[in-house]
Amino acid sequence: GKRVDYSARTVITSDPNISIDQLGIPRAIAMNLSFPEVVSRNNIKKLTQKVKNGRYKYPGANYVIPVSSSNTQTWRGRDLRYSRNIKLRYGDIVKRHVLDGDPILFNRQPSLHKMSMMCHKAHIIDDDRYSTFRLNVSATPPYNADFDGDEMNGFLPQCIQTQTELSIIADIKKQIISPRYSKPIIKMVQDSVLGSYKITNDDTIINWRDFMNLSTYLKGIDYNIIEKGKNYSGKKLFSKIIPDKINIKHKKTEIKDGDLINGFVNKTVVNNLIIGYSWDRYGADKTRNFIDNCQRLISNWLLMDGFSVGLGD
């Protein structure tokens, strides 16, 4: 295909610690791409510091396009490789580096349906040792991506209107339900599914220290209900991440008011039922939080209680 400005392409690697709507971006890419921010009363101090940092210090800026006396931009931008002693004025345009939270349009080819391009929030990896995009593994099914060397493309929108449009229309958390199947397409996969089954088995017991430790990885948890010195079931810990007022009966599994009472959580329960009901009742944000919490909980619990595969399997 053709080459375009304000884009980046590199290999993707998995990261279960970032949210499904975040995209880990290497610092080298964040410094190469730029967003044109107009200088105003609200941001002149921040942008002045970025101009002082220049092109080679993050977070900095690459160019300054000064406003002319007739209040129109002169497109002869000043390259901050050669000049950093610039006094900003209201109306100037500073082409600053990519920052945490900036919307990024992310794409994997071949682009076969609308979810082949979705909007993520930038999460800058401030370490020169890493040079790949980081993607949550639960966000891979819509892209049909895996981590065996796939490359993906990022596109940085160049105005606030485009940022807003992407955030409203193409935000990945609003694409959790597939328009083709009307079922969740962004869901638990691989270790998260297996771990959800293991942690909700009847014989899983967790002491209060591990219970507290695992709870620190979760968002929106009430710590006051955890009693010191008491053992808890794995069902109790998993119940803490299920949204309130979710009621499910499926074969032997029973969830009442967000509390797992009987049975276990398998692939059907966690993906089709919990995520599906959460989407219908609470919408995108709470469903995104459940997926993030489930992934963090299971990933860290499996470090304590793993599993093995033998020849018999």
Residue ranges of predicted features:
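Core mixed alpha/beta domains of very large multi-subunit molecular machines
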Residues: 1-176, 238, 242-244, 249, ...
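Flexible, glycine-rich loop/tail regions that form catalytic "lids" or insertion modules at the edges
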Residues: 13-14, 22, 109-112, 136, ...
